[in-house]
Amino acid sequence: AVRVRHFCAYLMEEHGGSMKRMARQPLERLRPALLAVPGIGPETADDILLYACDKPVFVVDAYTRRIFSRHGLVSESIDYDSLRAIFESNLMADVHTFKEYHGLIVWTGKDYCRTKPNCAGCPLQPLLPGIPPTA
């Protein structure tokens, strides 16, 4: 509840309580402002930017890191901004694309790529390192 209060105070003080007014701010100014709000980290800031403000920012979460590290595409220790940069430089900078891609990652993470993997039936299982391609 404290984090929500901090965000609400920011929204009232900086944007007159208007999400629409906040969303009109340029991304280059808005992201650092959100990160300065106590309790808002990179993932939460990017969630707000993508889903509430329709800004083309890719949201990285635990599912993203887990799926892509298990498939040998990134190191488990990759930092948030580096992983985000990989997506943003390789996907079309489009809000709809980022929302859909992130949603598919969340779905895959919740259903298959959990802390304890449930690889049976996962659509990405054939892409795991060491799994021979099927004909």
What spans do the regions from the language model cover?
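Catalytic cores of DNA base-excision repair glycosylases
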Residues: 1-135
